[in-house]
Amino acid sequence: MAIKSLESFLFERGLVGSYAIEALNNCTLDIDVNHYVSRLLTNKREQYLDAIGGFPTSLKMYLESDLKIFKDFNITPIFVFNGGLTYNQLEASGHFTAASASASISSTTTSSSGTNATTRSNTESVLLQRSRGWTQWNNLISSNQNSYIDQPIQPQEPFRHNTTIDSKAYQNDLIAYFIEHGYMYQVAPYSSWFQLAYLLNSAYIDAIYGPTDCLMLDCVDRFILGMEFPNKEFRFIDRSRVMKDLGCTHEEFIDIAMAVGNDLQPTTLPPLQIYPVPQLFDIALEMVLNTGTNFYAYQLSTTLQNDSKENIQNYQRGISALRYMPVLKDTGKVELFVQEIVVSEEDSEKNNKDGKKSNLSSPSSASSSASPATTVTKNASEKLTYEKSSTKEVRKPRDIPNDVHDFIGQMLPHEYYFYRSIGLVTGKLFDAIVTGVYPEEPPLGGGSSTSYKKLVSKSVEIFKNKEINLLTQPINRYYQIKQIKQVKWYAANEPTTLTNRMSPSMFETINHLIVKTETSDEKEFSISEFITTINGSSNMAKDFISEKVIFPNSVPIESKLNSPFNLLSTNFLRLLVLLEFFTFDFKEKLLEPTRWGEVFLKLNELNIDSKYHESVIIFLVFLKCDVLKLDEEVQPPAPSALSQATLRSYPEESLYVLLITRVLTLFQVDQKPSNYHGPIDKKTLIFRDHLSFIKENLNELFEAVLISSLTSGEFNRLSLDNFGWARKIVRYLPFKLDSPNTIMAMMWEFFLQKYLHNGNAKNDALSLVATEFNTYKSTPNLDEQFVESHRFLLEISKVMQELNAAKLIDENVFKLFTKAVEFTTTALSS
């Protein structure tokens, strides 16, 4: 988030300059992705995204349009993502309680009177609006039961309003897009706009495109706030001009920013909480100029009020984070980006002498929580003294305090930050290790179903304990004994402690599994190629169990994993062992597939299209978790998007529709970029939440297995540069992209409903879908998409047949699904 209400204030005062985009010809432009995406996806765009899930397709359209103009003017964009969150940001996002407070507010509040809009966090606003959307839709369904037969009811209440879309949710999709199209990107250790400032100061880039927070950095003179591509112009802010017009010092400006709320301190502090958000900065500035208000001093003077201690700490942490923010430097290390301060030459020499006497800064002299008010006064008085005495001034970095971990976070190894910077890991597990909390936040469908909560509980043994052990084992022993808890939004006061220490460690149980092929240098990793490699072995134990581990430094380079294919294949096999798709025993020299693994290894033999292999694995793992049968109603029951007329008149066919829509949540419709506004279905979305949860956990477990291999030294890490890591490894990682939306599932749902009520007339049913989903613009090849999705159902039917033969699913479910697919075949071919 940017400094609250500052941008509109600057526009009103005419402090935002404009210039022809030609001025950026041949320059390297660093772009803050979070700020950039917030400008592309404004409040009126993608308002129903939370009701269908998936990647916002309109974002790709805007992105492609902008990149074309960048290319026309030979501008080299570098996209920088946010990394970890500081303590203030974690608290504001509800990290430590898994957004349980926000979820409870949204579940009990349906009007804007629930909390003050000024004090409400973005998370609260998102969940509140989502709850309003579903409440209004449920009411529409109930009130239209008598008239609703076969034409779906369109939602009226948007699911997103006055909230920003967090780009981190789509980070992996954006990174995949940038890699595919050859654009540079980076994930910052923490704040992206600080990383931009570092790169600008180091002369690696020519300009930055970032939020108004950049005004708090005195090392950034100018920055681009926005692009007006239709007019071939860009909007920029000149810091010196802004400060001159505001009539306040830089320190006073920071004081105002910390009070109204900004990226480093998101909470609006007293006494500003009573004012409307659009007027916050204007009112705060007026208070400073007219009455000499110092907002930090105000917090200190109201210690008897509720939350006063918390407000003081929030302010102090915000100031401290501004002064000491970690960035990824050109050395490859993550170090603090410490801004310089102006001192007299005499004081500088005195401090240097004192520094030699004591190697450690005392908490009292270098504490990050030192009074900002005192600092402001001191700086001002020192400045006057220097001017009067004409003492020579010098710039020197601030002393680094010894409590940075209290307001930023604990330090992880530099190698971990490197893997995060290239998008190899999403970073959620890293955040859990740093904070001691892995939050399970409410999914799009609310997560109220018993089966979803059961899935969350089961994930501890299936995924989380293994992931935490794999990631903490290679690093400082402190993290191996540090308590890390899974905190669930529906039971925040009953956290589950994850297991850090195991004997033997998780890595020791799998590090003898090695996949090496002779032609691996030419291969690109895919699940299909992996299956071919495994099935090509006549003796899995002999071919894939190594007598000796390959991670010690004494092992020659040529004996290690030297190709991306071998690296990813080795760790994918280890993943399948941890998921119990394979049985592995090093002492017994045993490696063989379980019944689940046998079905998986038949995917090529069954001629399952390789692009569906990942979806099939997600489906298999979901069935293996056994939390919800494919034909089972969720509890408590969710309202169906089918009409009561359909449910009463066609009970058997309605069950077919249920199975079909659930499976099709794994299928992504090929649609053109558009802002979706069409039918929604909470029952289908809830099932999608289950599969999305499985996919996210599969991704994190594979990340943990891969990181454990890399940090141990099994792979020749120097064989790739940054671009090589992106193109040859990150690009081919499985389970990275966001789960499909529910559009194709709903298209089939309402197609079949119309088909049943309209005398089995296929064309009328397709016309209904085209009209209701506005496919003339978004999906012009509607017939092809129905054929392709039907082919996907036939592929899943083959897998179900194998599962039934292996007695891994209930035979009644298999028969029911077979009939459901036959029903779709009849409807589509009529």
Curated annotation (Swiss-Prot):
Disulfide bonds: none annotated. Residues 361-373 have a biased composition (Low complexity). Residues 347-400 are annotated as: Disordered. GO terms for molecular function: DNA endonuclease activity; mRNA 3'-UTR binding. The keyword Ubl conjugation applies. Residues 380-400 have a biased composition (Basic and acidic residues). InterPro entries: MKT1_C, MKT1_H3TH, MKT1_N, PIN-like_dom_sf, XPG-I_dom, XPG/Rad2, XPG_DNA_repair_N. Residues 130-380 are annotated as: Interaction with PBP1. Changing K453R: In strain: ATCC 24657 / D273-10B, ATCC 200060 / W303, Sigma 1278B, YJM 1129, YJM 270, YJM 627 and YJM 789. Signal peptide: none annotated. Disruption phenotype: Normal vegetative cell population growth rate and morphology. Decreases expression from the HO locus. The modification Phosphoserine is found at S358, S362, S371. It is found in: Cytoplasm, Cytosol. Changing D32A: Decreases gene expression from the ho locus. Its main location: cytoplasm. One of its GO terms (biological process) is DNA damage response. One of its GO terms (cellular component) is ribosome. It holds the Pfam family MKT1_C. Changing D30G: In strain: 2574, ATCC 24657 / D273-10B, ATCC 200060 / W303, Sigma 1278B, YJM 1129, YJM 270, YJM 627 and YJM 789. Keywords: Cytoplasm, Isopeptide bond, Phosphoprotein, Translation regulation, Ubl conjugation. Involved in 3'-UTR mediated RNA regulation. Binds to RNA-binding and RNA regulatory proteins. Complexes with PAB1-binding protein to promote mRNA interactions with poly(A)-binding protein. Promotes mating-type switching in mother cells by positively regulating HO expression. Interacts (via C-terminus) with PBP1 (via C-terminus). Belongs to the XPG/RAD2 endonuclease family. Present with 3430 molecules/cell in log phase SD medium. This is Post-transcriptional regulator MKT1. The gene is MKT1.
